[in-house]
């Protein structure tokens, strides 16, 4: 299970980096797309924090 959680965290980090690049590239060019991607980025950051919490719980319980 820990392997899956770490994989999700890694995938979320990749998505965060990808969306951050889109935000930079659309700055001053396409505010509608930028606003949409900012909202998506917030979701991805929340997902990452959630799974980091799951990982901490597994580690605390000695399941990691």
Which residues does each predicted region cover?
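Iron-associated oxidoreductase/ferritin-like identity signal
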Residues: 1-64
């Amino acid at each position: 299970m820990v392997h899956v959680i770490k994989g999700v965290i890694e995938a979320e980090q990749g998505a965060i980096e990808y969306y951050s690049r889109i935000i930079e590239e659309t700055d001053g060019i396409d505010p509608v797309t930028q606003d949409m991607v900012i909202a998506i980025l917030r979701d991805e950051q929340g997902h990452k924090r959630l799974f980091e919490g799951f990982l901490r719980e597994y580690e605390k319980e000695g399941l990691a």
